[in-house]
Regions:
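Terminal leader/tail segments of proteins
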Residues: 1-89
Length: 89
C-alpha cells in the first residue's frame, strides 16, 4: 500500500523508503530496489544494496524541483546519469 502525500512532505517517506504517491512523483519497490519516479517513468532516486543514487541529468524545471523536495538529506548519495540509474533498477 502506498501512502498519499504531497511532494513537500514526502522527503521523510523517501528517506525511510516507504512507498508513496504524491503530485506526479511516486516511491515504490522494484524487487528489492526502492525507486522514486517523476511522472511514473523518469527515475530521480534509487536505493539499492544500502546505497542511494541520484539522477544527475537535468530533465525539466519541474523535475529539478521534485528532486530538491524529495532528496533524502543526510544520506551519502552517488550521482549517476539516467541510463546508469535505469541499469540499477
Amino acid at each position: 500500500m502506498r501512502i498519499k502525500t504531497t511532494n513537500s512532505e514526502a522527503r521523510e517517506l523517501v528517506k525511510a523508503r516507504v512507498p508513496f504517491k504524491a503530485s506526479n512523483t511516486d516511491g515504490e519497490y522494484v524487487g528489492n530496489t526502492y525507486v522514486v519516479y517523476s511522472y511514473l517513468w523518469y527515475p530521480i532516486f534509487v536505493y539499492k544494496d544500502g546505497q542511494w543514487f541520484e539522477n544527475k541529468d537535468k530533465y525539466s524545471p519541474t523535475t529539478s524541483r521534485q528532486t530538491s523536495q524529495l532528496r533524502p538529506l543526510g544520506e551519502d548519495i552517488i550521482k549517476v546519469n539516467t541510463q546508469e540509474l535505469r541499469d540499477l533498477i
